[in-house]
Swiss-Prot record:
Residue span(s) of domain NACHT: 211-528
Job description of the protein: Plays an essential role as an potent mitigator of inflammation. Primarily expressed in dendritic cells and macrophages, inhibits both canonical and non-canonical NF-kappa-B and ERK activation pathways. Functions as a negative regulator of NOD2 by targeting it to degradation via the proteasome pathway. In turn, promotes bacterial tolerance. Also inhibits the RIGI-mediated immune signaling against RNA viruses by reducing the E3 ubiquitin ligase TRIM25-mediated 'Lys-63'-linked RIGI activation but enhancing the E3 ubiquitin ligase RNF125-mediated 'Lys-48'-linked RIGI degradation.
Protein name (Swiss-Prot/TrEMBL): NACHT, LRR and PYD domains-containing protein 12
Residues in FISNA domain copies: 129-201
């Protein structure tokens, strides 16, 4: 009897200790040691330190006996703040005090079963259910777990990054996993973090608690594990206490297979641990129920459009499609709450069923959580640190570990390498290499076996994967397996090796453990020898590529990347030697020929799908192949580069580009600047972290670009728009610019996070590189210190720069003195753009000193938005009378006013003024300014273009201007009068002007109230053979059908005439 009591106590105590997390178990041991340090039965710390739950229970009972061990454990549970275990233990003690005569017919059955039998009749139904949920969700099996192996969910689970989701459905990518792209949004600016604990709490947007929460996330991002953790934490009393009395978990994949009708009662019974559930208690307060519907995207199409009446009460039996729809649509018990998980591909279908749900997106692991995951996966802290540091230093691997599933794959692969005694190698740097390493690790030989053990009929597996991919099918029935030569024995082998998963509760249906693995095997199907792929689709790789067309939205995107990666020589060797698969020898040549034909059809320009194309080339990791593939393109434009990984992929490929003449790399970081609108990526399936603006790119990125400058003698233009190079990146890039082989002529570094200190390296590059003639540094924090450094290079006799753009570079008046000295010493500089800098009148006065210098050869000067006033125009006027080289001057968006323009006209009228283009848009001009400009048009024979847009000139101003336009000496060819307050009366003057002026060819009148009368008058003049006008823009006017007909007729009689309306 004593032995029975001991077994009983050991069973009960070890069960309770098993529920403690690792930290809690350590605290339990410390508190226990404190409580017993004065007693004779004290347990030595050396015995407790490494003891697990079972060993700890044995130590307690050995030293104190069953009763005292149980008492000590309960008091310690209370001290470590696990009151749920203390309260449950107290209740069990009450039941155990049942008087003699209780059930004794169990005989020699397990005392643990006797305990349950004794407790059940008097146990609270909610506690019974909580116990069941704990048992069901406490343990989880890894995908490669052997029989009986499991992991405590609480010990492995790592908190996921959740944000409130407000993105448009068009921004959601249709594919389920694409490790080559990250989440294309700036998390800190476009989404609000949220915790699981507050999912059903009100916030500023909704004062009432939401009844439905949708958690979306790409495949492998951790939706199901999170749903399981919610169930477990509720059962443990850590979550939603006081909010929900019961949580029920519904697996949509299992619901797919239900062929019989069922009711809500039946659904509850299927979740309940006992034959009957307390339905009346549940119905009584439905608002305290939460149903977790896991995997909405996996439901069959019939679930989205069910036929028949809704299920409106608990007892009604309906097909599972109708039952689940009634539950989701809140036709059945609208008071209850729902937590629905889904992939982005099903969001639109789900939206149609719900009313005002809260949307939450699972973004995966942050950097800190990735580290935490590694330390939880590897129990050895030293080993965990070694692996994490390796992965952190390996950019592609570390980026992919943002996705929990991929994080697990990487950990599994690297653990296999460590256990094999090998060093951590660089073979895991691509997506394909990671998946191949995972596959090989699953096929490691058993002890004593001579070689890897591949699955039987592996080619049939690849054929099944490809067939499912083309038909967009992820669940397979028995007949699908038979079609590809796979029988039950094959499936059993795949399950054992964790390549092919058989659903525990859906035995008739099978699936790959993850869509990405199906795509991996589908790619292998295409590299097998012809006829070796089973009953799958056509193995013509060109059909695959044509359908894919390097589109990130294509359902073939990841498969195509895997295809390139599998053709890597080392990977191919693994396939042939380790798995005995024969790879088709002509696939590489087929790929190169297809790329060549695509280049020819696109005019040797790579733009559409360029980033996806680079991702494919990155996977193959073969220098010669990449060089051949890129040799057919002369112009390469890569847009929307949103992550460090994408920058790395791009620079990796461009380093191996030997033929391109023009390279443009556009980053995708959001900007509030209207001029630089964000080019945001539309995909939500993407799974990499977008680069924050405050972060600079890795050195390797700039090193690769510098290498491209050294090795590609054809490269003459490089544009790096919104690439966060930073000072270190610029230094590395300039090493390439200074290389003798560099022939670059045009360098654009607009908004590349360049500080003033980096200008020293740029200055040295200007001196060393005599080919460089154009440079754009706009949108960088150059400032006065940077300008000083930059001008040292610009003043050097060897500098050959002809154009420099310094828009919005935080320059002030002091910078103009430096630039003036450049204008006085550098005869090569002909274009200068200082737009968007607060130069003010003082700065312009200093700049004019350089403009008046005899050495100055400047032809084009942009001074838009420079805080200039009328006072600056006097200085400009005197400069225009002296400078013989200036041809274009832009003063738009400065408050010059009529007085300023009248002063400017004095210089414009001077006989030596050679200005041809003058822009005065949005300069607060009125009709008075037109009088002075009219005189200029008569006196200045060089002026060809005049922009007066967005000034309140009015009809009187145009009348004054027309006097100059009608003068025989006027040579103006283009005139902008957009939004100048003109009416139909102005058209009378224009009518006569166009009849006289023989040089004006372009007239822009957008957003003026000319009306039908005014426009028809213009049409009358335009129809005259003597009218020389070729461009007339009339956008923004409300014209009737008759006027539009007149314009259409005019287009017919004068097809060369560009009429915009």
């Amino acid at each position: 009897m004593l032995r029975t009591a001991g077994r009983d106590g050991l069973c009960r105590l070890s069960t309770y200790l098993e529920e403690l997390e690792a930290v809690e178990l350590k605290k339990f041991k410390l508190y226990l040691g404190t409580a017993t340090e004065l007693g004779e039965g004290k347990i030595p710390w050396g015995s407790m330190e490494k003891a697990g739950p079972l060993e700890m229970a044995q130590l307690l009972i050995t030293h104190f006996g069953p009763e005292e061990a149980w008492r000590l454990a309960l008091s310690t549970f209370e001290r470590i703040n696990r009151k749920d275990l203390w309260e449950r233990g107290q209740r069990e003690d009450l039941v155990r005090d049942t008087p003699p005569g209780g059930p004794s017919s169990l005989g020699n059955q397990s005392t643990c079963l006797l305990e349950v039998s004794l407790v059940t009749p008097r146990k609270d139904p909610q506690e019974t259910y909580r116990d069941y949920v704990r048992r069901k969700f406490r343990l989880m099996e890894d995908r490669n777990a052997r029989l009986g192996e499991c992991v405590n969910l609480s010990h492995r689970y790592t908190r996921l990054l959740l944000v409130k989701e407000h993105s448009n459905p068009m921004q959601v990518q249709q594919q389920l996993l694409d490790t080559g792209r990250g989440h294309a949004r700036t998390v800190g600016h476009q989404a609000s973090p949220i915790k699981i604990e507050t999912l059903f709490e009100p916030d500023e947007e909704r004062p009432e608690p939401p009844r439905t929460v949708v958690m979306q996330g790409a495949a492998g991002i951790g939706k199901s594990m999170l749903a399981h953790k919610v169930m477990l934490d509720w059962a443990d009393g850590k979550l939603f206490q006081g909010r929900f009395d019961y949580l029920f978990y519904i697996n949509c994949r299992e619901m797919n297979q239900s062929a019989t009708e069922c009711s809500m009662q039946d659904l509850i019974f299927s979740c309940w641990p006992e034959p009957s559930a307390p339905l009346q208690e549940l119905i009584r307060v439905p608002e305290r129920l939460l149903f977790i519907i896991d995997g909405f995207d996996e439901l069959k199409p019939s679930f989205h459009d069910p036929q028949g009446p809704w299920c409106l009460c608990w007892e009604e039996k309906r097909p599972t499609e109708l039952l689940l729809n009634s539950l989701i649509r809140k036709k059945l018990l609208p008071e209850l709450s729902l937590l629905i998980t889904t992939r982005p591909t099903a969001l639109e279908k789900l939206h149609r069923l719900l009313e005002h749900p809260r949307h939450v997106e699972i973004l995966g692991f942050s950097e800190a959580e990735r580290k935490e995951y590694f330390y939880k996966y590897f129990h050895n802290a030293e080993q965990a640190g070694q692996v994490f540091n390796y992965v952190r230093d390996n950019e592609p691997l570390f980026t992919m570990c943002f996705v929990p599933l991929v994080c697990w794959v990487v950990c599994t692969c690297l653990q296999q390498q460590l256990e094999g005694g090998g060093l951590l190698r660089q073979t895991s740097r691509t997506t394909t290499a990671v998946y191949m390493l995972y596959l090989l690790s699953l096929m490691q030989p058993k002890p004593g076996a001579p070689r890897l053990q591949p699955p039987p009929n592996q080619r049939g597996l690849c054929s099944l994967a490809a067939d499912g991919l083309w038909n967009q099918k992820i669940l397979f029935e028995e007949q699908d397996l038979r079609k590809h030569g796979l029988d039950g024995e094959d499936v059993s082998a795949f399950l054992n090796m964790n390549i092919f998963q058989k659903d525990i509760n859906c035995e008739r249906y099978y699936s790959f453990i993850h869509l990405s693995f199906q795509e991996f095997f589908a790619a292998m199907y295409y590299i097998l020898d012809e006829g070796e792929g089973g009953a799958g689709p056509d193995q013509d790789v060109t059909r695959l590529l044509t359908e894919y067309a390097f589109s990130e939205r294509s359902f073939l995107a990841l498969t195509s990347r895997f295809l390139f990666g599998l053709l890597n020589e080392e990977t191919r060797s693994h396939l042939e030697k380790s798995l005995c698969w024969k790879v088709s020898p002509h696939i590489k040549m087929d790929l190169l020929q297809w790329i060549q034909s695509k280049a020819q059809s696109d005019g040797s320009t790579l733009q559409q799908g360029s980033l996806e194309f680079f991702s494919c080339l990155y996977e193959i990791q073969e220098e010669e192949f990449i060089q051949q593939a890129l040799s057919h393109f002369q112009v390469i434009v890569v847009s929307n580069i949103a992550s460090k990984m994408e920058h790395m992929v791009s620079s990796f490929c461009l380093k191996r580009c030997r033929s391109a003449q023009v390279l443009h790399l556009y980053g995708a970081t959001y900007s509030a600047d209207g001029e630089d609108r964000a080019r945001c990526s539309a995909g939500a399936h993407t799974l990499l972290v977008q680069l924050p603006e405050r972060t600079v790119l890795l050195d390797a990125y700039s090193e690769h670009l510098a290498a491209a400058l050294c090795t590609n003698p054809n490269l003459i233009e490089l544009s790096l728009y919104r690439n966060a190079l930073g000072s270190r990146g610029v230094k590395l890039l300039c090493q390439g610019l200074r290389h003798p082989n560099c022939k670059l002529q045009n360098l654009r570094l607009k908004r590349c996070r360049i500080s003033s200190s980096a200008c020293e390296d740029l200055s040295a590059a200007l001196i060393a590189n005599k080919n460089l003639t154009r440079m754009d540094l706009s949108g960088n924090g150059v400032g006065f210190p940077g300008m000083m450094l930059l001008c040292e290079g610009l003043r050097h006799p060897q500098c050959r720069l002809q154009m420099i753009q310094l828009r919005k570079c935080q320059l002030e008046s002091g910078a103009c003195q430096e630039m003036a000295s450049v204008l006085g010493t550098n005869p090569h500089l002909v274009e200068l753009d200082l737009t968007g800098n607060a130069l003010e009148d003082l700065g312009l006065r200093l700049l004019c000193q350089g403009l008046r210098h005899p050495v100055c050869r400047l032809r084009t000067l942009w001074l838009k938005i420079c805080r200039l006033t009328a006072a600056a125009c006097d200085e400009l006027a005197s400069t225009l009378s002296v400078n013989q080289s200036l041809r274009e001057l832009d003063l738009s968006l400065n408050e010059l006013g009529d007085l300023g323009v009248l002063l400017l006209c004095e210089g414009l009228r001077h006989p030596t003024c050679k200005l041809q283009t003058l822009r005065l848009g949005i300069c607060r001009l009125g009709s008075a300014a037109c009088e002075g400009l009219s005189v200029v048009l008569q006196a200045n024979h060089n002026l060809r273009e005049l922009d007066l847009s967005f000034n309140d000139l009015g009809d009187w101003g145009l009348w004054l201007l027309a006097e100059g336009l009608q003068h025989p000496a006027c040579r103006l060819q283009k005139l902008w009068l957009d939004s100048c307050g003109l009416t139909a009366k102005a058209c009378e003057n224009l009518y006569f002007t166009l009849g006289i002026n023989q040089t004006l060819t372009d007239l822009y009148l957008t957003n003026n109230a000319l009306g039908d009368t005014g426009v028809r008058l213009l049409c009358k003049r335009l129809s005259h053979p003597g009218c020389k006008l070729r461009v007339l823009w009339l956008f923004g006017m409300d014209l009737n059908k008759m006027t539009h007909s007149r314009l259409a007729a005019l287009r017919v009689t004068k097809p060369y005439l560009d009429i915009g309306c």
